[in-house]
Amino acid sequence: MASEQNIQTFRDFLTQYNLVAEQCFTSCVNEFGSRTVNAKEESCANNCLDKFLKMTQRVSQRFQEHQILNAQANGAAM
């Protein structure tokens, strides 16, 4: 049971990782004339990932706050 949950968690992580990588690549890499990443593309990709991580952290924080409020409301109702 725990192993299945770990596998699903890892699959979810990989799916999310691939979506972020694709989105940041599509948004940031526009020139394919060189084999190297230029400074503008690197900066864009770093900013893209940073924004995603901050957004994920903020959503997680809000979800926890919501869960706490629900638990308090359910405790007060009893």
Curated annotation (Swiss-Prot):
Keywords: Chaperone, Disulfide bond, Membrane, Metal-binding, Mitochondrion, Mitochondrion inner membrane, Protein transport, Translocation, Transport, Zinc. Signal peptide: none annotated. Disulfide bonds join C24-C48, C28-C44. Pfam families: zf-Tim10_DDP. It is found in: Mitochondrion inner membrane. One of its GO terms (cellular component) is mitochondrial inner membrane. It is a peripheral membrane protein. A motif (Twin CX3C motif) lies at residues 24-48. InterPro entries: Mito_inner_translocase_sub, Tim10-like, Tim10-like_dom_sf. One of its GO terms (molecular function) is metal ion binding. GO terms for biological process: protein insertion into mitochondrial inner membrane; regulation of multicellular organism growth. The keyword Secreted does not apply. The keyword Membrane applies. Mitochondrial intermembrane chaperone that participates in the import and insertion of multi-pass transmembrane proteins into the mitochondrial inner membrane. May also be required for the transfer of beta-barrel precursors from the TOM complex to the sorting and assembly machinery (SAM complex) of the outer membrane. Acts as a chaperone-like protein that protects the hydrophobic precursors from aggregation and guide them through the mitochondrial intermembrane space. Belongs to the small Tim family. Heterohexamer; composed of 3 copies of tim-9/tin-9.1 and 3 copies of tim-10/tin-10, named soluble 70 kDa complex. The complex associates with the tim-22 component of the TIM22 complex. Interacts with multi-pass transmembrane proteins in transit. The twin CX3C motif contains 4 conserved Cys residues that form 2 disulfide bonds in the mitochondrial intermembrane space. However, during the transit of tim-9/tin-9.1 from cytoplasm into mitochondrion, the Cys residues probably coordinate zinc, thereby preventing folding and allowing its transfer across mitochondrial outer membrane. PANTHER family: MITOCHONDRIAL IMPORT INNER MEMBRANE TRANSLOCASE SUBUNIT TIM9B. This is Mitochondrial import inner membrane translocase subunit Tim9. It comes from Caenorhabditis briggsae. The gene is tin-9.1.
